[in-house]
């Protein structure tokens, strides 16, 4: 059984026991969070209707609330003028473990 969930502005394919990184959530380590399901597949049975999906949620436990993504360097450069600008960014993420699809 797996599900496609909406988590942090993205969609992720998850099964029970999976550990995924999502954009920063407002939750502490050990908290339980719920994600709405966009699609659930159970063997040959596919649940796709809005009424059926409203009854289903995917529960997850926060494993790490202080994870960070890779450092991304941005360089802006103007030719022949000596103008150069560097900037960096690291996305703040939350690590969650899927505990139930119900």
From Swiss-Prot:
InterPro entries reported in the protein's UniProt record: bL21-like, bL21-like_sf, Ribosomal_bL21, Ribosomal_bL21_CS
Top-level taxon of the source organism: Bacteria
Listed GO MF terms: rRNA binding; structural constituent of ribosome
Nucleotide-binding recorded as keyword: no
Keyword terms, alphabetized: Ribonucleoprotein, Ribosomal protein, RNA-binding, rRNA-binding
A GO BP entry: translation
GO annotations of cellular component type: cytoplasm; ribonucleoprotein complex; ribosome
Role: This protein binds to 23S rRNA in the presence of protein L20.
Family: Belongs to the bacterial ribosomal protein bL21 family.
Subunit structure: Part of the 50S ribosomal subunit. Contacts protein L20.
PANTHER family on file: 50S RIBOSOMAL PROTEIN L21, LARGE RIBOSOMAL SUBUNIT PROTEIN BL21M
Protein name: Large ribosomal subunit protein bL21
Organism expressing this protein natively: Bifidobacterium adolescentis (strain ATCC 15703 / DSM 20083 / NCTC 11814 / E194a)
Record gene name: rplU
């Amino acid at each position: 059984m797996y599900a496609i969930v909406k988590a942090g502005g993205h969609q992720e394919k998850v099964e029970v026991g999976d550990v995924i990184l999502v954009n920063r959530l407002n939750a502490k380590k050990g908290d339980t969070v719920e994600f709405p399901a966009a699609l659930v597949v159970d063997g040959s049975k596919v649940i796709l209707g809005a009424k059926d999906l409203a009854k289903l949620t995917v529960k997850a436990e926060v494993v790490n609330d202080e994870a960070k993504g890779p450092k991304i360097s941005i360089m802006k450069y103007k030719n022949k003028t000596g103008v150069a600008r560097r900037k960096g960014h690291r996305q703040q993420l939350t690590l969650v473990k899927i505990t139930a699809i119900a």
